[in-house]
Regions:
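Secreted, disulfide-rich extracellular signaling modules
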Residues: 1-191
Length: 191
């Protein structure tokens, strides 16, 4: 049987409200239309009122700084390679402002600065064994190593000024590296 189908496109505006705790990262090219949909994101981190560094920090030295971006769902080939660059934000994002999907990231970071981290990754992490991957406690993530100096500066900020860690507003305005957040920019890869 043959069926006639009619479709129509309707504009919804330049952007939509982006107030969410979910972030989207990637690039997808529609094979039918050639339309490219790309998504990067800005992230500002919450500091809980009960935050405390663990007593396990030995000799006041941080040995590793890492951000994990947890993956809930994805489309496309899980073995496609992507390149992600991470830039520190130089401006606090106002929690009272509604941000839209047409936000200009360049207003929040130094475009002349090199990224503080670059990560090539696939959505299916091939660096772990199958036993770990299929464990019920495993959460798929993109693990991004940051300069240890950022972790050390955050730790020293906590030791020297614990009040900066008592709530998100104080943390974001503390001037401590990483406190304003990061821009996660997709540089290469297509679903």
């Amino acid at each position: 049987k043959t069926y006639d189908v009619t479709t129509a496109s309707h504009p919804v505006g330049e952007s939509v409200l982006a107030r969410t705790s979910m972030s989207y990262l990637g690039r997808f090219t529609d094979p039918e239309t050639g339309t490219v949909v790309k998504s990067d994101f800005l992230a500002q981190f919450h500091c809980s009122e009960t935050f405390a560094f663990p007593d396990s920090v030995k000799d006041h030295k941080i040995t590793k700084s890492e951000i994990k971006l947890y993956i809930d769902k994805f489309i496309g080939d899980s073995l496609t390679s992507f390149k992600l660059s991470v830039y520190p934000l130089n401006k606090v994002m106002d929690p009272e402002v509604d941000y839209y999907t047409n936000i200009e990231p360049s207003k929040y970071y130094d475009t002349n600065q090199k990224p503080i981290a670059v990560k090539w990754f696939t959505l299916s992490d091939r660096t772990i064994d199958d036993e770990t991957r299929w464990d019920l406690d495993y959460y798929n993530s993109i693990n991004i190593s940051l300069p240890v100096s950022i972790g050390q500066a955050i730790y020293e900020g906590y030791i020297n000024n614990p009040d900066a860690f008592t709530n998100t507003d104080k943390w974001a305005n503390s001037g401590i590296p990483g406190s304003k957040g990061f821009y996660f920019k997709l540089e290469a890869g297509d679903r």
